[in-house]
A protein has these predicted regions:
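Hydrophobic face residues on amphipathic alpha-helices
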Residues: 128-132
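Two-component/phosphorelay signaling modules centered on CheY-like receiver
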Residues: 37-57
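Conserved phosphotransfer microenvironments
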Residues: 79-97
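Hydrophobic/aromatic residues positioned on beta-strands within the core alpha/beta folds
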Residues: 106-107
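A Lys-centered signature of the CheY-like receiver
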Residues: 125
């Protein structure tokens, strides 16, 4: 069992799996939010290449993602940052947070700064089947609160929990979200207490 401070680090993910009685061997239900239909189909195929992962729905915008999360209760969402009908992956991640669904961004252009409040990390396009498999395994380890036993992180995957404690290179003019500011302040205070 994890300590209280460890649970605070990833409370949504930890609670979601064990509150519902899921064990280590259960299937991870995944929602794909991608507006390129061909890429969504390819990603679905790559994800389901591993029998431990099941794509329960695909969506191409915010409304579709919210409806799919409400209907299918996925454990993880793979979310593109630029979506159909003016939606963004950021807005999808915020709304999926209301359903306790953690996100892994999948994008051709990564955010210029880490967003641990919104996503576990970002897998950059283009990617290989091996990149997808390793990224899902590492995301699952984070969500289940396991130590990562996979030493080789794909070069195009950035996990935000590994950046939180360190210095973050902010772009000039960037203003983080209120939740992000609160999280960063809490980490700064925790790091400066003796």
């Amino acid at each position: 069992m994890r300590t209280e401070s460890e649970l605070r680090k990833h409370p949504v993910q930890e609670a979601r799996f064990f509150r519902e009685g899921r064990g280590e061997a259960d299937v991870l239900k995944i929602l794909i939010v991608e507006d390129d239909a061909q890429l969504a189909t390819t990603l679905k195929y790559l994800v389901e290449d591993n029998p431990r992962y099941l794509v329960v729905a695909t969506a191409d915008d915010l409304d579709g993602a919210v409806a799919a999360a409400d209907q299918h209760a996925p454990h993880l969402a793979l979310v593109d940052l630029q979506l159909a009908r003016g939606s963004t992956g950021f807005s999808v991640a915020v709304r999926l947070g209301d359903f306790d669904v953690p996100c892994l961004f999948v994008s051709g252009k990564a955010p210029a700064f880490p967003m641990p409040d919104l996503a576990l990390g970002c897998l950059m396009k283009p990617f290989t089947a091996e990149d997808v498999h390793r990224s899902l395994a590492m995301a699952e380890d984070l969500m289940r609160g396991r130590e990562t036993l996979r030493p080789r992180q794909p070069p195009n995957l950035t996990l935000y929990d590994t950046v939180i404690g360190g210095e973050v290179d902010m772009q000039p003019g960037f203003i983080p979200s209120r939740r992000s500011l609160k999280t960063r302040l809490e980490h700064w205070i925790a790091g400066h207490q003796h």
